[in-house]
Amino acid sequence: MGERAAVSAALFQEGRSRMTAKQLPDDTYLDKIYTMLAQIEQEEGAAMDAAARAAYASIDGGGLLHVFSTGHSHMIVEEMFYRSGGLVPVNPILSDELMLHTGAITSTHMERMPGKAAEVLGKAGLRAGDTILISSNTGINTVPVEAALYAKERGLTVVCVTSKKISRTLASRAPEAK
């Protein structure tokens, strides 16, 4: 188990020791959660550390952490922006037509549209040396793929968060995907 997962498990056990038998949650569920956390730590710990270092370097150098996503995944953008006690230099890149509240069918169509990422990110104030976090459940739609390429071409450090398990089983919809 990685260091972060071990600390989480220790804190959990400390809190659990204060509970009565009636209050204890189902062990099977919690065991699965900790197994998943340990697996994520083992498989992605180095990548998560590299992403954190990149964001720190951007902010420490006077830059920003840009955060972008489409569909349901846009919620990570909202979670990272303007939170009490959170990071201040976060630039949320939110486009109404790529979010569900204006219509799920329209949003789905728009996130598959070539050129849409450049249109949205072109107005976002991206600068070389900054870091951008792009979140996508599957990683297969055109806009997130084009957004990563657009940012990389402009000298940003690109951090992508997706489900590898899902994205490996689906064909990309992005014409330029490699």
Stretches found by the model and what they are:
Residues 3-18:
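Short, Lys/Arg-enriched N-terminal segments with co-localized hydrophobic residues
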Residues 19-42:
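Generic N-terminal amphipathic, Lys/Arg-enriched alpha-helix
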Residues 25, 47-50, 72:
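Short, contiguous, pocket-lining structural segments
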Residues 34, 38-41, 56, 60, ...:
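Short amphipathic alpha-helical segments enriched in leucine
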Residues 54, 67-178:
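Glycine-rich phosphate-binding loops that contact phosphosugars or nucleotide phosphates
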Residues 36, 58-64, 128-132:
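Short, surface-exposed connector motifs at secondary-structure boundaries
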Residues 43-60, 120:
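A short, well-structured juxtamembrane/interface segment
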